[in-house]
A protein has these predicted regions:
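Histidine-centered divalent metal-coordination motifs
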Residues: 169
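Glycine- and charge-enriched loop/helix tracts that form the active or gating conduit
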Residues: 1-159, 163, 173-190
Length: 191
């Protein structure tokens, strides 16, 4: 009574704000734990232990064996977190995002016109970051309608769908990219 039994060093992980796997088989036993690790990072502001990140990167392909409804449940919770953008970047760096959303890959390196200083992928991530910033200060940005917006975004599903929409907002650009022969300007008609 009153004594904490900590077989895996969880207290130290909490103090260090780290998410760490408890065994090498943890992701093979349940691939959805890959997403859960990222979700915990997003929700708690934690970071992945380097060995854990390496292992989930190696086993990310196992996500294709997981039930889609379990994957979507974790993704909704992850994207509903106030600051998921850094975690989405990390998911991209580990290859997890490409497994979940292969349609995002063509955005990388897709150059834009002079109105954009970033390629489409970097722009999409930047847009997600700005959306998160806006959501944190709705009354300042929308002084007359922030309460209605906040009510719409009360459920984690609505908040997640908004952020996913922002991340995917330029998905059509790679397929519609063209070059105006007269001006030499990059175009995206119909995106």
């Amino acid at each position: 009574p009153g004594r904490i039994i900590d077989l895996f060093g969880g207290r130290k992980d909490l103090q260090r704000a780290r998410v760490r796997m408890t065994s090498d088989a943890v992701f093979a036993d349940d691939p959805v734990r890959i997403l859960r690790g990222f979700r915990f990072c997003a929700q708690l502001g934690f970071t992945l232990d380097p060995a854990t990140q390496q292992r989930l990167q190696e086993q990310a392909g196992l996500l294709s064996q997981a039930a889609p409804e379990r994957i979507s449940a974790e993704l909704y919770k992850l994207f509903a977190s106030p600051a998921c953008c850094p975690v989405v970047r990390q998911m991209d760096q580990t290859g997890v995002l490409e497994i979940l959303f292969p349609e995002l890959s063509p955005l990388k390196g897709c150059q834009q016109n002079e109105y954009h200083h970033l390629d489409v992928w970097a722009h999409s991530l930047e847009a997600l970051k700005h959306m998160e910033d806006i959501l944190e200060c709705l009354p300042d940005v929308f002084p007359n309608s922030w309460k209605a917006l906040q009510e719409l975004l009360e459920t984690y599903q609505n908040r997640a769908v908004l952020k996913l929409g922002v991340l995917f907002h330029d998905l059509g650009k790679p397929d519609t990219q063209g070059l105006n022969p007269k001006t030499g300007r990059i175009t995206f008609y119909g995106h």
